A protein has these predicted regions:
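Conserved Class I S-adenosyl-L-methionine-dependent methyltransferase catalytic core
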Residues: 1-75
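Alpha-helical subdomain
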Residues: 71-239
Length: 239
């Protein structure tokens, strides 16, 4: 339903998006282009469909990306923009010693608590906030799953610098995205995702080198990229 009601409508303006180099929310929904989530979250029903869609993605793909690296040395995890907590659930299932804080906007957190919370697992908690503005929870590891591809390089750099400042010494960040090949000419699925980012967000999919170029200036080192063989890949960097 989310694809039919939001994504498909934006793709009707693909040619304009390519010419203008920006998303098509203004033409499609009358929403200013910089207000990325106003269209996605334009009603309670649309927000719920979006969160359910992301939850379905991580129920299929989550374990693979979280197992790309051994994350057991990171007992305290913060999932920034973690929506329903679906990826957090996969993380606590895979790593018995970890606790995960899901950090997202207040409306999202409240909906997650109503529809998706896991009261039987005390290792998952929710915290409200805007990761561009509000203090970030201290953690050993930050998960950024399908977050950086929403934003410009400048906004990604600002967010990564904030994460580095909040991260415990010796901790790290796990970026989960669909990686382009080094020359940017594939995989085809990732190229299509990048076009989708163009019509709907301020961002794009990136190559491993482009992610390194964002992470290193923010202060991260030992940056490792791993293909998972699935839809999404993993990048681990240390503070």
């Amino acid at each position: 339903l989310y694809v039919a009601r939001t994504t498909y409508l934006c793709w009707a303006h693909l040619a304009e998006a390519v010419r203008e180099g920006k998303n098509q929310y203004l033409k499609t929904f009358g929403v200013p282009s910089e207000e990325l989530f106003s269209a996605i979250y334009r009603s309670e029903g649309e927000r719920l469909q979006f969160l359910r869609g992301l939850g379905d993605v991580w129920s299929v793909e989550g374990r693979g990306v979280l197992a790309a690296f051994d994350l057991s040395p990171f007992p305290l995890v913060c999932d920034l923009g973690g929506c329903s907590g679906a990826l957090a659930k996969e993380c606590t299932s895979l790593y018995a010693g970890c606790h995960v804080t899901v950090f997202d906007m207040p409306d999202v957190v409240q909906m997650a608590k109503r529809h998706f919370s896991f009261p039987e697992d005390g290792r998952i908690s929710f915290r409200e906030g805007d990761f561009f503005k509000d203090p970030l929870p201290e953690a050993d590891l930050y998960l950024l799953a399908r977050v950086l591809h929403d934003w410009t390089d400048d906004k990604c750099s600002r967010l990564l610098a904030r994460i580095h400042g909040a991260c415990r010494t010796g901790g790290g960040i796990l970026v989960i995205e669909s990686l382009l090949d080094a020359d940017g000419r594939g995989p085809l699925t990732t190229q299509l995702y990048s076009l989708n980012m163009l019509v709907q967000t301020e961002g794009r999919e990136r190559t491993p080198a482009q992610y390194r170029a964002l992470l290193a200036p923010a202060g991260f080192h030992d940056i490792q990229c791993r293909r998972t063989g699935g839809t999404y890949d993993a990048i681990l960097a240390r503070k």
